[in-house]
């Protein structure tokens, strides 16, 4: 069942969906002051929503106390201007605990991450997410990826569940997504169910996802190059195909290819990008590792090229 307020704010977003990195100090501890700055700058740069403590925010590496502090800080810095959603994951009991912590911290919704490690059947997966959704009044977006892959029938069941308002796809199986969208549309006509492209660097595949009926996407690039992410989002929304393809060819494809050169770069390279832009958010926590120096140098060049493309587009 749809939560109208959140659905209305996300259906046609005014800007990219922002997944902030989590800031750490030199001792590896949480740096809330820098984190607040990161979130505040993102909202001011045009984010349509903040997804705190999710994959890019190293949800896996945060203690419950750190998680609650970050979500509360994101809510305070957003100050009601945009909705704030928080990650919730691990096994059912812990996911419920994180959901309740997010509610207490003032979050507007949840991104329900895949269960930790286990390979479950469809019935168990549906039950898990239903229990998470029942734990709080917060609307829930279910994250499909890795060990949480759904049949179209299971997504229909989830779409019928009170509190479950959408599906974020991090799998990249376009055939499956087409069948999921079709099944929900057929079985629940008129139901407003949200779909998100949640692949790393989702801009690279968003033209294909949009054609399937998946209009929303996450933007890790927004963390370190908001001007590029906003320009792409605007061009996509306005049907400016020339700008879309220019940014895909000149910025996003090179970035995706660089990201593929290291395990964990979907987070580590983004965090390096934030540091390159002048905000010291610290390093990633283990087991992730920092990008190689040569890759950071290449990232500098890619960002500079993207900025040139945006400036050229603005002058047209």
Curated annotation (Swiss-Prot):
The EC number(s) this enzyme carries: 4.2.1.41
Catalytic activity: 5-dehydro-4-deoxy-D-glucarate + H(+) = 2,5-dioxopentanoate + CO2 + H2O
Family: Belongs to the DapA family.
Listed GO MF terms: 4-hydroxy-tetrahydrodipicolinate synthase activity; 5-dehydro-4-deoxyglucarate dehydratase activity
UniProt superkingdom: Bacteria
Pfam families linked: DHDPS (PF00701)
Protein's pathway: Carbohydrate acid metabolism; D-glucarate degradation; 2,5-dioxopentanoate from D-glucarate: step 2/2
Protein name per its UniProtKB record: Probable 5-dehydro-4-deoxyglucarate dehydratase 1
GO-annotated biological processes: D-glucarate catabolic process
CDD domains with a match to the protein in the record: KDGDH
Keywords: Lyase
InterPro entries: Aldolase_TIM, DapA-like, Dehydro-deoxyglucarate_dehyd
């Amino acid at each position: 069942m749809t939560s109208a307020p959140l659905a209305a704010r996300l259906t046609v977003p005014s800007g990219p969906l922002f997944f902030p990195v989590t800031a750490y100090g030199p001792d590896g501890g949480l740096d809330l002051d820098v984190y607040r700055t990161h979130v505040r700058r993102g909202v001011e740069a045009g984010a349509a929503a903040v997804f705190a403590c999710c994959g890019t925010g190293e949800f896996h590496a945060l203690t419950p106390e750190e998680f609650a502090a970050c979500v509360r800080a994101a809510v305070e810095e957003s100050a009601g201007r945009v909705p704030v959603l928080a990650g919730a994951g691990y096994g059912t009991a812990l996911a419920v605990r994180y959901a309740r912590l997010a509610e207490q911290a003032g979050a507007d919704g949840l991104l329900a991450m895949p269960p930790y490690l286990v390979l479950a059947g469809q019935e168990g997966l549906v039950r898990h997410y239903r229990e998470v959704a029942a734990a709080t009044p917060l609307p829930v977006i279910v994250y499909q990826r890795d060990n949480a892959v759904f049949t179209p029938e299971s997504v229909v069941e989830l779409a019928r569940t009170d509190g479950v308002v959408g599906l974020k796809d991090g799998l990249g199986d376009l055939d499956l997504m087409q069948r999921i969208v079709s099944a929900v549309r057929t079985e629940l006509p008129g139901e407003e169910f949200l779909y998100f492209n949640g692949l790393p660097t989702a801009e690279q595949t968003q033209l294909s996802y949009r054609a399937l009926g998946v209009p929303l996407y996450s933007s890790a690039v927004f963390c370190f190059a908001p001007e590029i992410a906003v320009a792409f989002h605007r061009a996509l929304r306005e049907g400016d195909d020339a700008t879309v393809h220019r940014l895909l060819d000149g910025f996003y494809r090179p970035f995706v290819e660089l990201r593929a050169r290291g395990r964990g770069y979907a987070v580590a390279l983004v965090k390096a990008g934030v540091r390159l832009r002048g905000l010291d958010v610290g390093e990633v926590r283990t087991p992730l590792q920092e990008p190689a120096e040569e890759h950071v140098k290449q990232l500098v060049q890619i960002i500079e090229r993207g900025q040139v493309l945006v400036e050229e587009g603005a002058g047209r």
